[in-house]
Amino acid sequence: MAIRVRRSTGNVFRDLGFGPEAAEHLRVRSELMIQLCKLLQKRGLTQAKGARLLGVTQPRISDLTRGKIDRFSIDTLVEMLGRAGVRVSFVMTRRRRVA
């Protein structure tokens, strides 16, 4: 049985079959979620203390740490990072191909 290898697009969500816009939206949300989780871990915060810092409930922190990406908007994640004292900035680049 031959194994087929496909070159990645650089976006795991695109590779999984999501459209370009949806894949990019998911990529941004996942990166923001990862950064929030790293911040909580680096500061050694429990879910309850993290919730107080970020202005959300403990179950929301549980959703965050469990990767429930569908439960968070980019706006919400940016607000949470802001409450933790993190300034979010984006670098925008042009895609190589536009369909």
Spans of features found by a protein language model:
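Short, charged recognition helix plus adjacent turn
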Residues: 89-99
